[in-house]
C-alpha cells in the first residue's frame, strides 16, 4: 500500500491594509506575491509597501492621473495608465499639486512601464523608474469632435482617456502569448449614443505604442467606463 501525502500552502492575506501618504485618492493596486508587497497609485504618486502598510519606497513628480495597474511577475514590472489632460479630473490633480494646468491640445495618455526593483527609497524621481509609451489612439479620440444626430460633440466615443489595465491572452485563441489590455475611460452622458460602448485596446507586450486590436463592447451608458479590470484564468 502506497500512501502519498500532499500539503497545500494557504496564504492568508490581511483583510485591510492601512496606507497613508498620498495627497489624492488611491486608484490602482497590484500585489507582488513573491515579495509580499503591494504597489499602489495615489493619482499623482506611486507607492511600494509591505502588507502591513509600511511604505518601502515611493515615486513622485507625476503631474498627471496615474490610474489602474497590473503586475507582471515574470519581468518584475508594473504597467499603469497615466493621463495628462485638461478636463475636470486633470485640473483637479494639477490644482492639488500646485502645478500648472495642462492645455487641451497638450493632453496626452501613456502606458507607464514601472521597474519596481529600482524603487528602494522614498521619493524616487519618476524618470528613474518609469518608461512612458504614448498611446496616440486614445489622444486622438479624446481630442476629436464628432457629429452625432446633427450635434457637434467633444470627445469621440465619449473618450475621457484610459484607466483599466490587465495582462491576458488574446480573445478567441488557445495561444499562451500574453497581451496588455487598456480600457478607455468613458464620460457618462445619456444624451448621446456614441458612448454606449466600453473600448479596449490590445497591445503586444513588446510594442506598447501600437494597438493590434480595438474592441468595442456594448454596455450602454457608463460613468467613466472601466476603472479597473483583471484577467480570471479560471473563467
Question: How should each PLM-predicted stretch be described?
Answer:
Residues 52-99:
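Blade-loop segments of beta-propeller domains
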Residues 151-217:
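Hydrophobic, aromatic-enriched interface-forming segments
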Residues 23-30, 63-72, 137-145, 157-170, ...:
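Repeated scaffold domains used in trafficking and secretory/extracellular systems
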Residues 14-19, 117-162, 204-224:
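Surface-exposed loop and turn segments in beta-propeller and other repeat-based domains
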Residues 32-62, 207-208:
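Beta-propeller domains
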Residues 14-44, 163, 169-172:
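Beta-strand-rich domains and repeat architectures in extracellular enzymes and scaffolds
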Residues 93-121, 193-208:
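Beta-propeller blade signature
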Residues 31-35, 71-75, 169-176, 231-234:
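Residue-level detector of Asp-centered blade-edge/turn motifs that repeat once per structural unit
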Amino acid at each position: 500500500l502506497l500512501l502519498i501525502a500532499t500539503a497545500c500552502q494557504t496564504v492568508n492575506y490581511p483583510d485591510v491594509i492601512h496606507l497613508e501618504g498620498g495627497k489624492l485618492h488611491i486608484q490602482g493596486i497590484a500585489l507582488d506575491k513573491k515579495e509580499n508587497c503591494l504597489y499602489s497609485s495615489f493619482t499623482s504618486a506611486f507607492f511600494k509597501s509591505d502588507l502591513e502598510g509600511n511604505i518601502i519606497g515611493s515615486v513622485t513628480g507625476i503631474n498627471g492621473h496615474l490610474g489602474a495597474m497590473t503586475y507582471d511577475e515574470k519581468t518584475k514590472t508594473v504597467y499603469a495608465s497615466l493621463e495628462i489632460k485638461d478636463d475636470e479630473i486633470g485640473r483637479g490633480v494639477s490644482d492639488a499639486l500646485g502645478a500648472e494646468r495642462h492645455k487641451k491640445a497638450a493632453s496626452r495618455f501613456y502606458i507607464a512601464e514601472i521597474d519596481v526593483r529600482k524603487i528602494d527609497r522614498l521619493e524616487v524621481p519618476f524618470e528613474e523608474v518609469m518608461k512612458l509609451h504614448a498611446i496616440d489612439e486614445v489622444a486622438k479620440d479624446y481630442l476629436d469632435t464628432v457629429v452625432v444626430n446633427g450635434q457637434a460633440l467633444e470627445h469621440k466615443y465619449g473618450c475621457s482617456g484610459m484607466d483599466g489595465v490587465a495582462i491576458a491572452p488574446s480573445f478567441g485563441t488557445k495561444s499562451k502569448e500574453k497581451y496588455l489590455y487598456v480600457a478607455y475611460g468613458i464620460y457618462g452622458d445619456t444624451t448621446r449614443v456614441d458612448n454606449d460602448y466600453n473600448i479596449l485596446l490590445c497591445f503586444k507586450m513588446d510594442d506598447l505604442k501600437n494597438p493590434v486590436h480595438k474592441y468595442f463592447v456594448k454596455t450602454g451608458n457608463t460613468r467613466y467606463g472601466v476603472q479597473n479590470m483583471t484577467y480570471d484564468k479560471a473563467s
